[in-house]
Amino acid sequence: MRATTTLLNLDETKTLFHEFGHALHGLFRMVKYRGLADVEGDFVELPSQVMENWATEPEMLEQYALHYRTNDKMPASLMQKIRRSAQFNQGFEMTELLAAALSDMDIHTQETYEPFDVNAFEREALYTKRGLIPQIEPRYRYPYFSHIFDGGYSAGYYFYIWAQVLDKDAYEAFRSSGDIFNKKIARAFRKKLLSRGGEADGMTLYRDFRGQDPDKEPLLRACGFWVEPEPEPDSLAVKLPAVKRTLMPSANLLELRDKQENLK
């Protein structure tokens, strides 16, 4: 069998960064007791998803995205296309993810153990309640949506969406500093969050690192959903040049109206 070069596409590269984030979370934990190593389910995806942000940054692509034969760096034009494509179809993708997370909750909050029509339940959950359209086959159907019954994510698929809020806000700390490789912030992320495992509530750890509650704006910007707030009314005022005013001679308004009628 002829040997061939094994390459990674962009999605596989993001997955590599994602799983490396999980690995770092495990390697950096410095808790005294093994029982304090685990974190809440809706916090576990933060370390992995935040790593994905670096995968497509031009500064990072210059370091690893090299042509496998010539070793040439990726052209800047291609880097920009990759960046712009990140917002493609994000509205529908987010709708699908939210529908999947909510339908996961639907099936795990049933108050009856009696058998029921799964297909009818699915149609209600995805189409009637969540607004998906039947012309597009749903990505997450119950028969093969393994997260809802296998792998520890039952009633927890929302972890991924909540982690997007956290990871985009956490990455904003690096981005807004002007250096996505800011060592000071990276050390704080490791010391205040990654290394502490589950010794405190996840949001306590997050606030300790970020100094604030997570903000949804970075996620909305990343997806292309953000709309700049309307300026205050005073800022819309335009200063017009002075106009010479001529006073109209006093007259009886009824007389003026009558004259206007006569001209018609």
What are these regions (language model features)?
Residues 1-258:
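Cation-handling catalytic/transport regions enriched in His/Asp/Glu
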Residues 262-264:
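A positional/structural detector of protein chain ends, strongest at the extreme C-terminus
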